[in-house]
C-alpha cells in the first residue's frame, strides 16, 4: 500500500517516502497479525465499508460492528483531517486512484492519511509537505467535507492513496497539526459511513479552516526548516507509520484513536472540528466526544511561535467521564484496546511554531485515559504510538506532535509508542507492540526512528531498551526497532511497563534530543496511553498547559500543563496522572511517571539516561519556568527503565515553582485504575510521586499504586509541604534579598526607634503586643501550619541587626508572609508601624518581625521610654533645681503701691506662680526645677514628666536643646 500510495502521492510523499519509507514497517505490521489484530480489525471494518479488503483486515476484528462504527468514526475523522490536508485536491485524485486501486487500501490510506495528517506536520521530514498536505488537505477537504462528507471521503481516499506513503505523516499532522482533523475525520467517515456524517456537525467553519490552513502553512515552513535538519528522522517516522503496516496498525490505530473515543463513547461522535480553533495545533481523536463549540480547543500563544491547544473541558470531560475508563478497561482487554485508547484519546498539542521548537507538545487526552500529554515532536513517534499506542492518547498526540513542527521531535513520537504499552493488558501491550511493530516498526526502520526526530536515534539511551524497560512486552521488541524514539518512550515504558502511554522519553529528550525535550516531562504521565498525549512540551509549556492537566480529569491524568504548566514542571508533573490508563502496576509506574512527568519533567535525570534526557529536556525548557522541582528525582520514578515501580530518587526537595504544583490535583481522581500518583515528586512513583495525587486518588487508586496508599497522605503532605517549601523558599529568597519588600529587614528598626518620626513616640499598649494579635495571627499562621505549611524555621536572613537576635516563637516559625497581615489591624492606631509595614508590601515587614513582633514591640517600648525620657543625670544637668523664692517682691510692692495710687487693686495672683503639672501654687521654699525654657515646675512633678519625655510640658522645648540660662 505504501508503495502504491507513494506513487500516488509522489511529490508530497516523496519526502515522506524518504522519511516514511517503512514498507517494512507495514510488513512488520502484517507480520504481527496477533498484535495488529486490533488494527486489522479496525482496518477490516473500515475497509469493509470501503471495500472488500475488510476480510483481510478483519483478522482480529474483535467486534466488527463496534469496530466498524469506530472505524466509521475514525474514517470520518480521518476524512475530516485529511480533508483539511494540503492534499485536499490531490487527495481527490488519489482517492479516485486509490478507490480504483484498493478501497481497502484506500481505507488504510485513509487511516494512513489520518496518521499522515497527524504526523505529517511535525513527523515527516517534509514537515512542510506533510503539514502542508495536512493543512491544505485539511483545509480544503474539511471545507469540502464540511459541506459534503461524501466528497470528503473520496477526496480523503485520494488523499490517503496519495498520502499513503505519508499516511502516518498525514495522520500525525491530522492529529497534531490538522486542526480540522476532527472534521476531516468526520467528513471522511461520512463518505465511507454516511451515518457518521453527523460528525460533520463538528466540522470547522470555513474561517476556522482558513485559520488552520494558515497555521499549518506556518508549521509547514517551520517543520520544513526543522525537518531539513531531521529529514529522514521525523519524516521517516511519519512515513513509517504511514507505511501500510503502519497504516493498518499505526494509521488504523490512529484512526481508531480518532474514532475510538467517538465510537466507544458516542458511536461515531467526531470531535467537532468546528469546536476546535484553527489555531489549535492539536487535533483530537474524533473518538472522543465531539468537541462542541464550548469544548473548542483554546489555543494560547505565549509566543506567536507557540500554539497551545487546549481541548475544551467539556470535550475532555466527556472523554474522561467514564467512557474513557470503561473503554480503557475494555480496550485493555481486547486487541482493540489500543484502538479504543487511541480513539478515546483527545490530542491537545502545544506546538511551538518557532523553528527551533520543533517540539510540539501533544496534550492528548485519552478518552479512556484523558490525560494531557504534551508530546513534543511526538509526531515521529506519534504514528507508531498511534499504531502501537493507537488507543493511547500519545498516538493521537504523537500524531499531533508529528503534525506539529517537530518531526525532529521524534523523541516525542517515540514517547508515543511508549504509550501503546498501555499495559492495559498484555494483550493491549501486544497490541501496542503489534501496533508499534506495524506502525512503530514501520517507523521502527531507520526512517521510523526519525519519527523521533533525528535526535531520537541519537538519543538511543532511551532506545530499544526503553521499550523493553517500559513494557518488557512485545513492545520491547516492537519498540526496540524504534529505539530512537523509544528512548523517549523508554522512560515511559520502563516507568510503567504497563504504562504504554508513558509518553516516550521524548520529554526526556532534553539531554538526548535538544529538540525532543517537549515530551520529556509528559512521558512519565504518558505511562498511560492517555498520559502520553498529555505531555507538555517544556518548550510549548510556555504556552498554557495547565488546562491539559485539567483536561485529563477523566483520567488520573495530572494537570498536564502547566504546565505547561508552566510551572509545569507543572505540566510534566501533571503528566504523572496519565498512568491511570495503565493497569495498576502501570498506573503505579505511571503515577510515578506522571509525578515525575510534571515534577520530574524538571527532574530530568531521574532514572534512565533517557529519562534523564527527557527530564532534562523538560527541564531545559522548563527550567526557567519551573526550577527543578526536585521532582526530577520524582520524574526518575517513571523514568526507571526496567522497573516500573523502581524506587524513584527520593522525592527531591521540592524546589519547584508553586504554580506547577497546583495542577497535580484534577484528573487523578477520575481514574480508579489510574495509579499514576499525580505529580508529587515522591521518590517512588506512588510513594513519593503520588503524594500530590493521592489527595485526589481514591483509596482504590492509592492501594492499587505500589505506594499510593502511603503516597496519598504523602502526596497531601508533600503537596502542602511543597507549597510550604516554595513559600518558604520564596520567603527566604525575599528575606535574603533585602531589596525585596518581603525580605527587607524589619521596617528599618530606626523607624521603630522612639525618636523616629521626630519624637512621635509609639507607645505600644500591651494590647498591641502579640497577645491580642495571636488570635488573628494564629488563625492565619496556624491555619497554614495546620495545612502543612510548616515553613522552615523562620530565617532571619539579612534581618536587621536589631531584630536578628530575636528568635521567633515556635508558633510564629510557620508564619507565612501572608499570615502577618492580621497584625495590621492591631497596629491600626500606630501610624508608625503601619507606615513601616506599608512600604514593605503590608506583609513584608512582618517577615522580619515574624516571630518576634511582640518582642520588637516590647523592645520598642523599652527603647522608647529610655530614649524619649531623660535620665536623672540629664535632668539635673539640663535643668535648674532650686528652692522656690518669690521673685520681684520689690516689683510687686512697687506695682502694688502704684496701683494703690491709681486706686486699683493689684491682683495678688500675679505674684503667684503655679506648677502647671500639679496646678498648685508654688510655695516659698519648695523644691522647684526651672527648665531651659524658663518654665518652673515642682521638681517631683517635672521629674516624673521628664523621665518619660524630655520636652517641656508647656512649650515642648527639649531640655537638651539648650543649656539652662540660669546657673
From Swiss-Prot:
A motif (SUMO interaction motif 2 (SIM)) lies at residues 305-311. GO terms for cellular component: cytoplasm; nucleus; PML body. Its EC number is 2.3.2.27. Residues 880-882, 930-934 are annotated as: Ubiquitin binding. Pathway: Protein modification; protein ubiquitination. One of its GO terms (molecular function) is zinc ion binding. Zn(2+) binds at residues 915, 918, 938, 941. Residues 149-160, 629-642 have a biased composition (Polar residues). Residues 112-131, 232-251, 385-395 have a biased composition (Low complexity). It is found in: Nucleus; Cytoplasm; Nucleus, PML body. GO terms for biological process: DNA repair; positive regulation of transforming growth factor beta receptor signaling pathway; protein ubiquitination; ubiquitin-dependent protein catabolic process. SUPFAM superfamilies: RING/U-box (SSF57850). It catalyses: S-ubiquitinyl-[E2 ubiquitin-conjugating enzyme]-L-cysteine + [acceptor protein]-L-lysine = [E2 ubiquitin-conjugating enzyme]-L-cysteine + N(6)-ubiquitinyl-[acceptor protein]-L-lysine. The SUMO interaction motifs (SIMs) mediates the binding to polysumoylated substrate. The RING-type zinc finger mediates the E3 ubiquitin-protein ligase activity and binds directly to free ubiquitin. Non-covalent ubiquitin-binding stabilizes the ubiquitin-conjugating enzyme E2 (donor ubiquitin) in the 'closed' conformation and stimulates ubiquitin transfer. Belongs to the Arkadia family. Monomer. This is E3 ubiquitin-protein ligase arkadia-C. The gene is rnf111-c.
